[in-house]
Swiss-Prot record:
Belongs to the CoaE family. InterPro entries: Depp_CoAkinase, P-loop_NTPase. Residues 11-207 form the DPCK domain. It holds the Pfam family CoaE. PANTHER family: BIFUNCTIONAL COENZYME A SYNTHASE-RELATED (PTHR10695:SF46), DEPHOSPHO-COA KINASE-RELATED (PTHR10695). GO terms for biological process: coenzyme A biosynthetic process. ATP binds at A19, S20, G21, K22, S23, A24. Keywords: ATP-binding, Coenzyme A biosynthesis, Cytoplasm, Kinase, Nucleotide-binding, Transferase. Pathway: Cofactor biosynthesis; coenzyme A biosynthesis; CoA from (R)-pantothenate: step 5/5. Gene3D superfamilies: P-loop containing nucleotide triphosphate hydrolases (3.40.50.300). This is Dephospho-CoA kinase. It is found in: Cytoplasm. It catalyses: 3'-dephospho-CoA + ATP = ADP + CoA + H(+).
Length: 208
């Protein structure tokens, strides 16, 4: 079993569904001088040219997934594994340990009172073992769908299918230590983040 790193910082796991506002919340924490690591970015980093994982992917799926300039064709890979549970399982078994190790290393180097791990799949993966508290950016599904359609120019059907692949709203709420209901404007979201920032500073001072 993965062990929680012996970090000095309180680690807040930040998660939420598509178009929930988790990226905006993470950006506000960064504005408040709180370091944030994005699990999605780490997932991209581990398959950059020169990374061993990229070579393993090419050997397993074929070199057609590698573009002429040596970069992984992410869209083609997603399409390949989307409807193939076995191939998806193989890919996750390769990438998840690499992603989690990089996150652990980053968390171990944090020196601030607290830091943020932002991950859309925090509750679906073992990344939840790396955090001390879970903050869910919550949003009603109707608002979520409208935002995702406007932001990404996707159809309602596609947005609903994406939502269906993620853990449900109630599941997230049940596993949250803290919840921000993000059904208003950005000013409201930022205000709620600022309040939690003060709370987390207090927690870090008294509990760590």
């Amino acid at each position: 079993m993965n062990q929680i790193p012996q970090h000095k910082s309180l680690v807040i796991g930040l998660t939420g569904g598509i178009a929930s506002g988790k990226s905006a919340a993470a950006a506000k924490f960064v504005e408040l001088d709180i370091p944030c690591i994005d699990a999605d970015q780490v997932a991209r980093d581990v398959v950059e040219p020169g990374e061993p994982a990229l070579q393993h992917i090419a050997e397993h799926f074929g070199s057609a997934l590698i573009t002429p300039n040596g970069v992984l064709d992410r869209a083609a890979l997603r399409k390949l594994v989307f409807n193939d549970p076995e191939q998806k399982k193989w890919l996750e078994s390769l990438l998840h340990p690499l992603i989690n190790q990089r996150i652990r290393d980053w968390l171990g180097a944090c020196k601030t009172p607290y830091c943020i791990l932002a991950s859309p799949l925090l509750l679906e993966t073992r990344q939840r073992e790396l955090v001390d508290r879970i903050l869910v950016i919550d949003v009603p599904e109707s608002v979520q769908i409208a935002r995702a359609m406007a932001r990404d120019q996707n159809s309602e059907d596609l947005v609903r299918r994406i939502i269906a692949t993620q853990s449900g709203r109630e599941y997230k709420r049940q596993h949250a230590d803290d919840i921000i209901l993000n059904d208003k404007d950005l000013a409201h979201l930022y205000h709620e983040v600022a309040k939690l920032h003060e709370y987390y500073l207090e927690l870090a001072q008294h509990d760590r």
